[in-house]
């Protein structure tokens, strides 16, 4: 949704989460991921935050 701040959705067969990318990475919603999975996801987002934000702004303007 371009009306919201930059964010990323993470999904698998049974779970879904949404993370805000700015002003800092923040878990907005979690439905099904356990705490270990969320830490792993957070780490991946943190390592790729710049690329995710650039892609988001390229897509939504």
Segments predicted by a language model, with ranges:
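C-terminal structural segments of small proteins and small subunits
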Residues: 32-61
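A short, structured beta-strand/loop element
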Residues: 1-35
